[in-house]
């Protein structure tokens, strides 16, 4: 069982993993502005979202940013393109402020 650590620079890449492995995705975020990362296709049978949390860079500093920490377990063989968007939840008609896309092949 392996844990693969990824960040925004991994967007556009393809990774190969095995069932039982984990993907750890850390994306910079500042929810005080209303923006946060949303997984667009979290309903799939290849990756299971096990952890979704925000970590402040500077604890106790109002308005500071941090990272959205996401951990996925590879549940079975297959292929999925994991997509995330950086947007405000109430701005559904606007394009996202940022995107992340990763093709995951599990074999």
What does each of the following model-derived ranges do?
Residues 12, 35-38:
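A charge-rich, low-complexity, intrinsically flexible signal that marks solvent-exposed coils, linkers
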Residues 41-57:
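Short, solvent-exposed loop/linker segments at beta-strand-coil boundaries, enriched for Pro/Gly
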Residues 63-69:
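Aromatic sugar-binding surface patches on proteins
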Residues 75-82:
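Glycine-centered tight-turn and secondary-structure capping sites
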């Amino acid at each position: 069982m392996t844990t693969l650590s990824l960040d925004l620079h991994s967007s556009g890449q393809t990774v190969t993993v095995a069932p039982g492995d984990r993907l750890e995705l850390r994306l910079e975020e500042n929810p005080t502005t209303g923006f946060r990362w949303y997984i667009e296709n979290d309903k799939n049978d290849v990756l299971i979202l096990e952890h979704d949390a925000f970590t402040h860079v500077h604890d106790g500093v109002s308005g500071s940013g941090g990272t959205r920490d996401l951990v996925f377990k590879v549940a079975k063989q297959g292929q999925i393109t994991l997509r995330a968007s950086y947007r405000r939840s109430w701005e559904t008609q606007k394009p996202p402020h940022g995107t992340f896309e990763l093709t995951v092949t599990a074999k």
